[in-house]
């Protein structure tokens, strides 16, 4: 009798173990999908897009001068990143050199924009007198197209790196100011009231309540500043540069090298998305509670 009961217990234990293994497998698959699913969908989406592009280009529906094959674009990109044209060539240097030049100017301009924009936005949000003084200038300059200022900057600064960095800074600074400003202004009153109940001083209110609440707004402003800054890079290099990705686009257009032009445009998209993803990782590091709230 005991032997039969032992057999039943062993069978039940095996069934339980099998069920636990199935649950573990399902959890592991769910965890893998949550972690890598979005990347897999993105890769699949891009693969389909470039395959359709390649087929459409090879069909001859559009002149290759206007729409080269995706393979031609990637070939031009690889060649530009791995080789260097001789100094006497129509397009001297390599994509790598022009990319480094543009990224250097973007980094400097974006850094200056953060140094100016974050304190200015926080100050405008925290002081109504500063807000009244600066807000008309901020809105006026933020709504002004940067391209309209290029002739003025060329007149004052010439065709120099200073002119390009100035345009990049002005393109990136206003989204940062406006977002930091909005972050301070929209801080929940209940949080401030609770902190005051616990005896928080004015400085503690600012650094322990207002600033952490504003961090996501600042990160969003920097993300917008990256996009605007890249636009500033291209504008500055097209109209007043002799080097950089904007200059390279112009020279590729002048020589009807559409493969190179599309390669540079594709590279700009990759750079922009990479920098924005970098800011997301930065936000996850300096504001980990945001990741908890999104779960």
Place the predicted regions along the sequence by residue.
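Transmembrane alpha-helices
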Residues: 166, 170, 202-236, 263, ...
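C-terminal transmembrane helix and the adjacent membrane-cytosol boundary/short C-terminal tail
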Residues: 185, 220, 262-295
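Short cytoplasmic-facing helical segments at TM-TM junctions of multi-pass membrane proteins
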Residues: 176-222
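Transmembrane alpha-helical segments of polytopic membrane transport and secretion proteins
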Residues: 1-47, 277-295
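Transmembrane-helix boundary motif in ABC transporter permease subunits
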Residues: 108-138
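Alpha-helical membrane-interface segments at transmembrane helix boundaries
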Residues: 37, 41, 96-108, 131, ...
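Generic hydrophobic transmembrane alpha-helix motif, especially the helices
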Residues: 138-175, 182-183
């Amino acid at each position: 009798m005991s032997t039969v009961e032992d057999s039943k217990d062993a069978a039940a234990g095996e069934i339980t173990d099998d069920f636990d293994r199935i649950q573990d497998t399902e959890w592991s698959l769910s965890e893998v999908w949550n972690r890598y699913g979005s990347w897999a969908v993105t890769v699949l989406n891009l693969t389909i897009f470039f395959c359709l592009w390649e087929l459409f280009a090879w069909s001859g529906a559009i002149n290759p001068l206007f729409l080269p094959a995706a393979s031609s674009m990637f070939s031009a990109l690889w060649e530009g990143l791995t080789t260097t044209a001789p100094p006497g060539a129509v397009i001297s240097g390599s994509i790598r050199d022009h990319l480094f030049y543009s990224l250097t100017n973007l980094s400097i301009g974006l850094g200056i924009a953060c140094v100016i924009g974050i304190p200015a936005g926080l100050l405008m949000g925290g002081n109504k007198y500063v807000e009244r003084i600066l807000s008309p200038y901020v809105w006026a300059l933020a709504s002004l197209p940067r391209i309209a200022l290029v002739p003025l900057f060329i007149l004052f600064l010439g065709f120099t790196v200073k002119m390009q960095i100035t345009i990049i800074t002005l393109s990136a600074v206003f989204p940062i100011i406006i977002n930091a400003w909005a972050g301070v202004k929209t801080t929940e009153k209940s949080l401030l009231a609770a902190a005051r109940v616990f005896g928080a001083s004015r400085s503690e209110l600012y650094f322990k309540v207002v600033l952490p609440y504003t961090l996501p707004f600042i990160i969003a402003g920097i993300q917008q500043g990256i996009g605007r800054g890249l636009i500033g890079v291209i504008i500055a290099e097209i109209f007043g540069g002799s080097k950089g990705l904007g200059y390279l686009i112009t020279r590729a257009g002048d020589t009807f090298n559409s493969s190179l032009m599309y390669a540079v445009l594709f590279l700009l998209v990759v750079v922009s998305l990479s920098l924005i993803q970098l800011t997301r990782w930065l936000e996850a590091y300096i504001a980990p509670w945001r990741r908890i709230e999104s779960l």
